Swiss-Prot record:
Ranges for domain Clp R: 3-149
Subcellular compartments: Cytoplasm
Superkingdom in the source lineage: Bacteria
Region (C-terminal): 774-866
CDD domains: AAA, RecA-like_ClpB_Hsp104-like
Pfam families (UniProt xref): AAA, AAA_2, AAA_lid_9, Clp_N, ClpB_D2-small
Organism for this UniProt entry: Bacillus cereus (strain ATCC 14579 / DSM 31 / CCUG 7414 / JCM 2152 / NBRC 15305 / NCIMB 9373 / NCTC 2599 / NRRL B-3711)
Residues annotated as binding ATP 1: 209-216
Identification of the protein by name: Chaperone protein ClpB
Listed InterPro entries: AAA+_ATPase, ATPase_AAA_core, Chaperonin_ClpB, Clp_ATPase_C, Clp_N_dom_sf, Clp_R_dom, ClpA/B, ClpA/B_CS1
Length: 866
């Protein structure tokens, strides 16, 4: 036989038959080897044809294997290694297969021709086929359903058989099987799609919208309407096939193979005479799909059929990809009619989630409160700005349910703690058992008593946990059963099987509903007691997930955080000394935000800190970050002195398209996208170019900036602090006796500020805060703070440092300069105190656990070790 006259799959089967013969030590390849080789290919055509005939594949395989085992095997020195003979029976089989191919007017011998030849085989194989009721007529019937009217004209025809089933999925069948979630709302879009599909020509809608707004769901909604027969007469018996472009392209190694597969799909649709609607999700993938040198891409192959109305196609793609790929090909674009899928409102999202609630409850085995659904819609809309409803709200509910589900399946915390304590005591018991002294024996008795008590508690808790788990699983199983019965009822009513429908509606379903109600009431009754497991998803869980995703504290305040916020002003005052007004205004803004009464469309607070250098402007920003986030690293600090040139603006929001660094994004926008809840410090703003402030206008007023890539960056959860030295000379000169700023000095500073910044910029800032120069009393407090920081650095060596009052006075006099603020003081302490301590430490005079006193002698600081 000429192998070139066979298809690739037939050649592969003959090679596999040879391998089987070698592995069984047979000297010749027979028909039974070929039969088993065909059956062992899982997704092969032979298996598909036998499945269509309802043949038991495993029984057929076992029969073939037992026939192979009967064949004589040759091993040992007499065996001719590497020599295989083809039996005359196999040669005759292949000749018969060739004749079958001629009868069917095929150019190549394919797997189906070999199967038809097998049906005429005599002997053992004939007996096996007769036992399993395999006849030539049955084979031909099944072959026609798989192959249709296609002829074998290439060496890989199997790829074109049942093309739709292989490269797509039937959405209508999936709806009938209950695999698709219900689609709530979207009626206007579904009606528009139905209107376009009912046209004579150009009846191809394309759904365009942002990712996550529910484009695919609209098509699933149409499939559900087709199942319910809630569509016009022309669409009643239609089915929707979702085409899988990746499956179509995958494995197409040779030129023309991809086109052949796609053509087979299109031919099947054409033969259906409008019964099949083709749904292509991610429609832009057809542009350029399968395009190689001289080949035609999928888009161009679809155009003629789309224009003639032979192909009913529904597309779905995002706005950006539609513009980028489809609009570039006007001939393809004009064949589609756009249907814009808008993002649903928060109210619509709540309705969608209420419709999906039952499916989530059945899948996860939890109860979802209605408050959780409302919270998911509202919080996702407010805090997750880079994604779209309803997708982000559905994800929130799903993750919250999954959190509760994993808690149900894992050991409760209370039981886990008791179990660990038991393990710890058992280890201690084993160690004490080896000791003989009286004290150890007494301790052992006490320990054994505690251990037996704990084991009793643990066994009680474990039994309670198992019972609660069992109850939850029972409710979940009943819900699943009820869901199945409701699906069966829909199917029975659709098929007018009235007996079955009546039995379900009036018999089985009410019985299960009653049982479910009793189980839920029992669970509600048990809830009054102290339960180990939670099975409710409430708004707290949703808020917790939002906080985890974004880092923004949305969850209800726990007691510790409540106290911390009420003490925020005091905490800030401990580190920022002498600036009561600034501390008070900043802490008030944070309190308003966490209480939830701030304007949701503006930042938490925006402040300009004015004052001389070294009075605590930057320190307050750092302290605020430390207090709110337990880390100064959470502060986004931008030194505005780096933005002196006009073109430096692009570094804040990203370089424009075509410039180097376009892909990298801006320093400010990227930092806030990563950490939406943070303190943004714009240091030394008067040094920046005036153009920079135009960028900040939207940030201060609407709490958002659009970066160079067109993404909206949300600043609504940031505290924006800008520092400046403008007018510091007036502040230094204009102090009252009590340390407050004179009114005329305040006016002079504000006048200078208005001269430097535009009114529209200053008008958008919440507060302009003047930092007053530090007085001598405040400087003493700063000395204490510096010494405290030094002690913190020496804490691991248990060395304490103390400055006498005289030493403090001396440091204040020698180190403080009103013009430069507290920074020279820090440098002085570093030079005069820290250096002396370092010398003594290296010399070994100061050892660990020492108490060091710094005093003044002969107008000089000295160190005494105690």
């Amino acid at each position: 036989m000429d192998l070139n006259q066979m298809t690739t799959k037939t050649q592969e089967a003959i090679m596999s038959a040879q391998s089987l013969a070698v592995s069984h030590h047979h000297q010749e390849v027979d028909t039974v080897h070929l039969l088993l080789a065909l059956l062992e290919e899982q997704d092969g055509l032979a298996v598909r044809i036998f499945q269509k005939m309802n043949v038991d594949i495993e029984a057929l395989k076992q029969g073939a294997e037992s026939l192979i085992k009967k064949k004589p095997s040759v091993t040992g020195s007499g065996a001719e290694v590497g020599k295989l003979y083809v039996t005359s029976a196999l040669q005759q089989l292949l000749v018969r297969a060739g004749k079958e191919a001629e009868k069917l007017q095929d150019d190549y011998i394919s797997v189906e021709h070999v199967l038809l030849a097998f049906s005429e085989e005599k002997g053992d194989i004939n007996q096996l086929f007769t036992r399993l009721h395999i006849t030539k007529d049955n084979l031909l019937q099944s072959l026609m359903t798989v192959r249709g009217n296609q002829r074998v004209t290439s060496q890989n025809p199997e790829a074109t058989y049942e093309a739709l089933e292989k490269y797509g999925r039937d959405l209508v069948a999936e709806v009938r099987a209950g695999k698709i979630d219900p689609v709530i709302g979207r009626d206007s879009e579904i009606r528009r799609v139905i209107r376009i599909l009912s046209r004579k020509t150009k009846n191809n809608p394309v759904l365009i919208g942002e990712p996550g707004v529910g484009k695919t769901a609209i098509v699933e909604g149409l499939a559900q309407r087709i199942v319910k027969k809630d569509v016009p007469e022309g669409l009643k018996d239609r089915t929707i096939f979702a085409l899988d472009m990746s499956a179509l392209v995958a494995g197409a190694k040779f030129r023309g193979e991809f086109e052949e597969r796609l053509q087979a799909v299109l031919n099947e649709i054409k033969k259906s005479e409008g019964r099949i609607l083709l749904f292509i999700d991610e429609l832009h993938t057809i542009v350029g799909a399968g395009k190689t040198e001289g080949a035609m891409d999928a888009g161009n192959m679809l155009k003629p059929m789309l224009a003639r109305g032979e192909l009913h196609c529904i597309g779905a793609t995002t706005l950006d990809e539609y513009r980028k790929y489809i609009e570039k090909d006007p001939a393809l674009e004009r064949r589609f009619q756009q249907v814009l899928a808008e993002e649903p409102t928060v109210e619509d999202t709540i309705s969608i989630l209420r419709g999906l609630k039952e499916r989530f409850e059945i899948y996860h085995g939890v109860n979802i409160h209605d408050r959780a659904i409302v919270a998911a819609s509202v919080l996702s809309d407010r805090y997750i700005s880079d994604r779209f409803l309803p997708d982000k709200a559905i994800d929130l509910v799903d993750e919250a349910c999954a959190t509760i589900r994993t808690e149900i399946d894992s050991m409760p915390t209370e039981l886990d703690e008791v179990t660990r304590r038991i393990m710890q005591l058992e280890i201690e018991e084993a160690a004490l058992g080896k000791e003989t002294d009286r004290g150890s024996q007494e301790r052992l008795k006490t320990l054994q008593r505690e251990l037996s008590d704990l084991k009793e508690v643990a066994s009680g808790m474990r039994a309670k946990w198992e019972k609660e788990k069992e109850d939850i699983h029972k409710v979940r199983d009943l819900r699943e059963h009820l869901e199945r019965l409701r699906r069966e009822l829909e199917e029975a009513e659709g098929n007018y099987d009235l007996n079955k429908a009546a039995e379900l509606r009036h018999g089985k379903i009410p019985a299960i509903e009653k049982e479910l109600k009793e189980a839920e009431e029992m669970g509600a009754h048990n809830k009054q007691e102290n339960r180990l497991l939670r099975e409710e998803v409430s708004e707290e869980e949703i808020a917790d997930i939002v906080s985890r995703w974004t880092g923004i504290p949305v969850a209800k305040l726990v007691e510790g955080e409540r106290e911390k916020l009420l003490r925020l002003e005091q905490i800030l005052s401990e580190r920022v000394i002498g600036q009561e007004e600034a501390v008070s205004l900043v802490s008030d803004a944070v309190l308003r935000a966490r209480a939830g009464i701030k304007d949701p469309n503006r930042p938490i607070g925006s402040f300009i800190f004015l004052g001389p250098t070294g009075v605590g402007k930057t320190e307050l920003a750092k302290t605020l970050a430390q207090s709110l986030f337990d880390s100064e690293e959470q502060m986004i600090r931008i030194d505005m002195s780096e933005y002196m040139e006009k073109h430096a603006v692009s570094r804040l929001i990203g370089a424009p398209p075509g410039y180097v660094g376009y892909e990298e994004g801006g320093q400010l926008t990227e930092a806030v996208r990563r950490k939406p809840y943070s303190v943004v410090l714009l240091d030394e703003i008067e040094k920046a170019h005036p153009e920079v402030f135009n960028i900040l206008l939207q940030m201060l007023d609407d709490g958002r900036i659009t970066d160079s890539q067109g993404r909206t960056v949300d600043f609504k959860n940031t505290v924006i602090i800008m520092t400046s030295n403008i007018g510091s000379a007036h502040l230094l000169d204009g102090l009252e006796e009590d340390g407050s700023i004179k009114e005329e000095s305040r006016d002079l500073v504000m006048g200078q500020l208005r001269g430097h910044f535009r009114p529209e910029f200053l008008n958008r800032v919440d507060e302009i805060i003047l930092f007053k120069p530090l007085t001598t009393n405040e400087i003493k407090g700063i000395v204490d703070k510096i010494v405290k920081e030094l002690q913190g650095r020496l804490a691991d060596r248990h060395i304490t440092v103390e400055l006498t009052d005289a030493a403090k006075e001396f440091v204040v006099e020698a180190g403080f300069d009103p013009m430069y603020g507290a920074r020279p003081l820090k440098r002085y302490v570093q030079r005069q105190v820290e250096t002396k301590l370092a010398r003594e430490l290296i010399a070994g005079t100061i050892t660990d656990n020492s108490h060091v006193v710094v005093d003044v002698e002969n107008n000089e600081l000295v160190v005494h070790v105690k």
